[in-house]
Amino acid sequence: NSNVEGKSDRISLDSSYLALSNDLYWLNILLGGSYTWSESSVVKSAKISELKISQFYTGAQINLLGSFWQVSLSQYINYAAIQNLLVDPPYDEVHMFKGDFSAVSRIPHWPVYGLIASSWQHAVQEDLAGALTFSTGGSSSVRGYEPGFANGDDGYHYNVEAHYNGLNAW
């Protein structure tokens, strides 16, 4: 037990603009930002972090659609301004590249489908604030592990899954 407690609040605004589309694909332009403030301290002792983070991102997402498959690819460029009130100098700036990919396909007339999903992050700087690190764990990345069981400045993960959906209770 580390006796550390903290809180974090975040407000964000995300937008998507449909730039191109037809029956086989669509392209979205993405733009957004967020503001996060968090603090943590050793219980009944000293404050160990107090952060204010402003983030902005822009990117694109392309979706391709076939008769029995769909592919989605997103790429973002992120900028974050960090104010750490407990260090000197208290200001830092970070640039990151983030993305994700997913593909799903099914076999016609079979109750089987497959899924591939991945995400990545590359940060130009090192030693990112915890709120900006690439984190894995939980049901959306590494199943069976607690959310955030591993994190770092750069990261990549992928899932390959096969699903059977042919069981009927009645």
Give a label for each model feature.
Residues N1-W69:
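Gram-negative/organellar outer-membrane beta-barrel architecture
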Residues E39-W170:
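C-terminal outer-membrane beta-barrel translocator/porin domains of Gram-negative envelope proteins
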